Amino acid sequence: MSEQRKPCKRGCIHTGVMLYGVLLQGAIPREYMISHQTDVRVNENRVNEQGCFLARKQMYDNSCGAASLLCAAKELGVDKIPQYKGSMSEMTRKSSLDLDNRCERDLYLITSGNYNPRIHKDNIADAGYSMPDKIVMATRLLGLNAYVVEESNIFSQVISFIYPDARDLLIGMGCNIVHQRDVLSSNQRVLEAVAVSFIGVPVGLHWVLCRPDGSYMDPAVGENYSCFSTMELGARRSNSNFIGYTKIGISIVITNEAL
């Protein structure tokens, strides 16, 4: 795994405040997205036949958390999704967990906090961002367990200072928060938050999928990569202004206890 870029100390607090506008929200600059409305069901069949890991390009600007969770759940053997009120699965009467727009949309409604019909937005593209507690909620609805890792660094400290409710929300739902991630087992996947840098300046945060073998899936590109550094290279190829990803020390470990 490549060496992580160290954030510039100058103005780091200001940068942290700016980043918190998209706190773990899965937000990534619009110009970085290659395509928004992408259905990859055909691609799913191809990668499954090859026995490879799954990849999914996010449908919406801020749905990287949902797209990453969808791939993680499929790789961990989940094949059903709840037909909750207002979901596309309910409307189509389908309960299979597929690598398609229906399932990403249904998960995104949960991870963005728009699953409640009273606050449901007419335009899902404007639904908002995937927050840690809502990702954990969606993970549990899929029958999986999750805990949050919050390593001690400038990013996590700024986030905790500006958004103290984040920890309380997780604790309130009985989600464990630890300060160090253990070695992953084959029945685990990780949704990892990274800072996105353009022209050397952190401009947003983004969720990516990490696996026990060290490989990654970047939903902004919709591709799998052997390691963190090759994922950065893939992102650079998609946008000449992109500089890199920086790990911020916050991640969600997802486990299928049945495996």
Curated annotation (Swiss-Prot):
Any one cellular component term from GO for this entry? extracellular region
* Regulation: induction: Expression is temperature-independent.
| Annotated function | Virulence factor that eliminates N-myristoyl protein modifications in infected host cells. Could also cleave an array of N-myristoylated host proteins involved in cellular growth, signal transduction, autophagasome maturation and organelle function.
Where in or outside the cell?
Answer: Secreted; Host cytoplasm
Q: Tell me the disulfide pairings in this chain.
A: none
EC number in record: 3.4.22.-
Phenotype of gene-disrupted mutants = Mutants are not compromised in their ability to invade cultured epithelial cells or to form plaques on BHK cell monolayers.
Q: Does the keyword Hydrolase apply?
A: yes
Query: Does Hydrolase count among this protein's keywords?
Result: yes
The record lists the effect of residue 64 to A as: Lack of activity
Q: Name one GO biological process term.
A: proteolysis
Q: Which controlled-vocabulary keywords does the entry list?
A: Host cytoplasm, Hydrolase, Plasmid, Protease, Secreted, Virulence
Q: Where is the catalytic site?
A: 64, 206, 218
Q: Which GO terms describe its molecular function?
A: peptidase activity
- Any idea what this protein is called? Cysteine protease IpaJ
